[in-house]
Amino acid sequence: MCAIAFRLQQPNSPCIERAIAGNSTEWHGRLPRNPLRRASRWPLRWREPQPPAPWTGVRDATKPGSACVQNEAGVGSFIKPLAAAYGVAYNIVPVSSSEDCLFLNAWVPDWPHQSQLPVMVWLHGGSNRVGSGTEDAYDGTALASHGVIVVTLNYRLGVMGFFAHPELTAESPHHSSGNYGLLDQIAALQWVRQNIAQFGGDPANVTLFGESAGSIDATVLMASPLSQNLFRRVIAESGSAFGLGPERSVAYMEPLGVAVGKAAGAQPESQLATLRKLPAAQVAQIENSLIATQFKGYDPNASVVDGWVLPQSPAKAFASGTIEKVDLLAGLNAREFSAFRVGAEAAQKQSGQPPAKPGLGQQIAQFADATRPLYGNWTDLAVADYMGKIIVHGTPALDQATNDILGACPVGAEAAMVTSAGRHAFVYRFERSVPGPGESNLGAFHALEIPYVFNTFQVHTFSWLPFTPTDHKLSAVMESYWTNFAKSGDPNGPGLPLWSAWRTDKEPFLVYSESGDAIPKENFSPSFCHLSPDRLKQQLANM
């Protein structure tokens, strides 16, 4: 691995550590810190990402660009209560964010320059509200040492990235609004397609991979005609395109945008001009307030079925087979939702309110009400299937039920749809938990697989966890599977346990076990979400 930073010129060296992309409707980066796109100084706010303004000479790309606009705590607000469960006081590093944020970074191994290396493009998680491609957890050095180029990127978040409004729809030549964050991701993929060969990468062999919101976005892009031929494979860690709830059309989301303009004091006929002049943080604060009151149940930070970026809901696209025909590696962690439960408890405690302790019946009802709009009769079947366990074990069993209906069922459905489209799917479950005071309460929580995939155990984000040599051993295995898949579409390789491709009759999957071993198993999906192919397509078509 060469550890030099590149500037904006044709590279003379075959080894480049990091690279560019651009600014919120600009893109820069760290390979060369090259503006990939321009987007968010206010005249460009809520518009498609634009090519960067030209410049002469060498553009310094040795430092990372700003994160996109977000809460100053960033992903630290997610990590802090998890560390507290392990008895560690986690220090949140404030995030420096800006609307001038569309940058990408790349790690290129010290291989012959004309090698045509596979490319892995990472979409960070954070509920499409926080995070960036420059998080220490996503350092691509270890993955790139396996003979791949790793690219990470920023995209617009929250109200800057996912905001629909009638005036925006009217000014768009595509009569569309709401998917600016997705457009940034597509712009980054287009940059990779056009430029990565200059750095020894193969533009025809790109794997899009992500975690949580990044995983959801990656699978959503499978349903977008704008991403056609921009990637060949997808790795989806803990996030499914099917988890978006009722179809979110532009018409469904525009009333929230109008309410934001009204709350900002804008005149009805010129809300957009007012909103474009306000500080981004103020617009976000107004929207968050409305979500907490007038628009409860809305998720303002997810993709919109706009007729252009997304002609139909991702679930419908999967059901009809109108998706990008790519190979898929997908899975989830054994106790994804323990992290959100612990985070909610910490937030409630911090607010000064007494801890809410709903009765078991109320917990079950809350679970059913929260999941039924997303998954229809899967919810009722899950409640029936888990009722006895929930009565006996309480919250841990509810954690498991939530994990299955929001995680396992959608992953199995995606694998089935990809397989029916003639491609290969490989499914996993990550069960390894880190020994320590928080283990019993958290288990293999949401995002825990990230340091294993990137081999970033030592970075600040995860430094509070007492990892052992077993964890490092498992990381080496997972790195190999992930990069093998990126190279050929088959994760298997010498010395690795056989990971069988998905078959609907046996549902094979690989467990990254508590002991740190990779163990092949079968029958991935819970019994309540076993549907015939026709029934599954019907259920997805109704989402």
Labelled PLM ranges:
Residues 233, 241-242, 277, 281-469, ...:
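Substrate-gating cap/lid region and adjacent catalytic-acid/histidine neighborhood
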Residues 142-143, 223-227, 439-444, 501-502:
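Short glycine-biased active-site loop of nucleotidyltransferases that positions the nucleotide triphosphate
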Residues 125-127, 212-214, 279-282, 432-435, ...:
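Short, internal active-site loops enriched in acidic
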Residues 156-159, 209-213, 429-434, 497-503:
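Short, solvent-exposed turn/loop segments enriched in Gly/Ser/Thr/Pro and often Arg
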Residues 492-510:
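Core catalytic loop region at the nicotinamide-binding pocket of NAD(P)H-dependent oxidoreductases
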Residues 2-179, 203, 365, 460-478, ...:
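Non-catalytic accessory segments of hydrolases
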Residues 36, 55, 275, 450-452, ...:
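Bulky hydrophobic/aromatic "packing anchor" residues in well-ordered structure
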Residues 75-76, 83-273, 289, 308-344, ...:
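Serine-hydrolase-like catalytic core of hydrolytic proteins
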